[in-house]
Amino acid sequence: MKRSLILILSIVLALSASTLGTLAYLTDEDSAVNTLTVGNVQITVDETAVNTSGEAIQGEPRRQANHYHLIPGVSYTKDPTLTVVKGSSQAYVRMLVKLDKYSCIKKIAALGGDAFALENLVNGINSSLWKLQADPTIDEQNDTITFEYRYHQAVDGSDTAEDVPLEPLFNQFIIPSPVTSDELQAIDGMQITVYGHAIQAAGFSGESAAWDAFDQETGS
């Protein structure tokens, strides 16, 4: 027997830069979008508008969240895309993917069990462009797992006449058909949150130093 569930994806926007060696952050938050801004870097994160069956809605602008009714074995369109806005200084960018209900996810053999990887749930990650960083971060207290993907090079929008959209982090997701009804019920309402981050490249010796400073300043 096949069951359906709702998978909620929240797109979170974040921006940052360095100024005279100092990082300062301005934050604004509402129920749908968490925006972090600093300096001369601006990004957006969005995805194709789809209906609850995961089908693209023609003529609908890209949006920051979609809701799904899922059936195991069916692929659903989802293409979180980070765009560097024209006029932005050269910046390092990354995307973080956080899933809740991890204690339930790791019990599902079809998703890899304790060896769960994001690729067991989504399709289309271009690993030559988006570089997975080390092991995922597991937060047992909040029951989440987070994967970090850094873009393979700094992106410069300072001399461009148009915004610079990067390749989507992935383009679809699927709940494998071997998932049982009990397993499906356990992850009903699971939330995936995709965060976009950018930090101005100037003033740092490289991307590692930049992200270390970003994480220290924001508590990421």
Locations of regions flagged by a protein language model:
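Acidic/proline-rich low-complexity IDRs
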Residues: 14, 19, 25, 95, ...
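Broad hydrophobic/π-residue packing in well-ordered secondary structure
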Residues: 22-28, 36-37, 81, 94, ...
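Aromatic/His-enriched, Gly/Pro-containing loop or helix-boundary segments
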Residues: 58-70, 145-160
